[in-house]
């Protein structure tokens, strides 16, 4: 009957969802709301949702952009299993091939819509070294340092003995305090577990700080508390100087129809995105959106800049330029916090 058929279909869908949840190790997240998931957890959930349809080909657009290194390695291992065990063809676009490079059967480099290189991973890396393409900086460190272009730690280990290390620079004296957290406790709901518990720290002027941690460890939550967007239920936040936040979902900042209505022309020029001035901000790529959002944050003139994944979606050359820009800001007395 029709009713029995509907029941069977629902059971089949539920069974397939359960299989995908187990394959991607998502069982601990099944009772969570999607809004409470971290960026990396949402990415894994999206991949699992795509696989419920049993596709033969997966097209993934920057799938590792929101993943920490440990989660990225796990994600890539899942993709490798999908390819090797289930025969799924995987085509992945990325600005940072990194660990994925060694697992690929072939790599294609696009420049202005044209294919400038297509080869196996090692030949691809050698071609980048010979051409001096800016994407060279996106290769694993070993492939940049050595002519043998090792793509994995195992390949690079025999060559590491030839390296000589420089001593680390002496630490600079601390400046004035620009942000202080004292015994901060935060939870998204009254009966939920604490995301931040009795956290204390002090930031000083002219420094660049990094916040690292696995997906779901509370990095973005901490930035939200620092910025005053999220209110802790216990503890104290002191912000004696103006503070600006670049959120993980940068599109929340876009309230105008043109980029040049959001960011000053001089800032667009400094960030190398003046050509985007007349574009609609919601039509931009992920990396372009991050740079426009960063421009908006810089235009506030705030002394403390809280940047959540500012390099997500940026290619190697753009990352290097952004790093130089941030170092210049710190030298000018700004405080930068990076997730």
Q: Where in the sequence are the language-model features?
A:
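ABC ATPase C-loop
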Residues: 50-51, 298
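The feature captures the beta-strand-to-loop junction immediately N-terminal to the Walker
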Residues: 212-214
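Conserved beta-strand-loop-alpha-helix hinge in the C-terminal portion
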Residues: 110, 114-145
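Conserved ABC ATPase "signature" region
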Residues: 12-29, 264-278, 295
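Catalytic Walker B motif of ABC-type/P-loop ATPase nucleotide-binding domains
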Residues: 58-61, 305-308
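Short, small-residue-biased leader/transition segments that mark boundaries at the very start
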Residues: 1-8
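Conserved ABC ATPase signature
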Residues: 33-37, 41, 280-284, 288
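H-loop/switch region of ABC-family ATPase nucleotide-binding domains
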Residues: 94-95
């Amino acid at each position: 009957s029709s009713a029995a058929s509907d029941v069977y279909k629902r059971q089949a869908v539920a069974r397939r969802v359960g299989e995908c949840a187990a394959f991607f190790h998502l069982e601990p997240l099944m009772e969570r709301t999607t809004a409470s998931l971290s960026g990396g957890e949402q990415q894994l959930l999206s991949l699992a949702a795509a696989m419920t349809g049993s596709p033969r080909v997966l097209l993934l657009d920057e799938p590792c952009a929101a993943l920490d290194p440990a989660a990225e390695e796990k994600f890539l291992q899942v993709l490798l299993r999908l390819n090797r065990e289930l025969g799924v063809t995987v085509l992945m676009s990325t600005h940072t091939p990194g660990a994925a490079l060694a697992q690929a059967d072939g790599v294609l480099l696009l420049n202005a819509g044209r294919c400038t290189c297509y080869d196996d991973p090692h030949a691809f890396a050698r071609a980048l070294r010979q051409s001096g393409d800016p994407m060279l900086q996106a290769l694993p460190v070993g492939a940049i340092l050595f002519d043998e272009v090792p793509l994995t730690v195992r390949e690079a280990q025999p060559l590491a003995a030839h390296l000589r290390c420089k001593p680390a620079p002496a630490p600079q004296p601390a400046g004035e305090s620009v942000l202080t957290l004292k015994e901060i406790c935060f939870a998204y709901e009254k009966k939920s577990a604490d995301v931040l518990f009795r956290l204390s720290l002090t930031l000083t002027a002219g420094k660049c700080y990094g916040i690292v941690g696995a997906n779901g460890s509370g990095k973005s939550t901490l930035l939200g508390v620092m910025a005053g967007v999220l209110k802790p239920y216990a503890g104290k936040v002191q912000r004696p100087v103006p503070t600006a936040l670049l959120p993980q979902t940068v599109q929340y900042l876009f309230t105008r129809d043109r980029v040049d209505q959001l960011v000053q022309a001089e800032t667009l020029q400094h960030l190398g995105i003046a050509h985007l001035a007349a574009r609609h901000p919601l039509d931009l790529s992920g990396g372009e959106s991050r740079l426009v959002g960063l421009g908006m944050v810089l235009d506030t003139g705030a002394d403390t800049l809280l940047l959540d994944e500012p390099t997500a979606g940026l290619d190697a050359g753009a990352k290097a330029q952004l790093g130089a820009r941030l170092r210049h800001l710190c030298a000018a007395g700004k405080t930068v916090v990076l997730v």
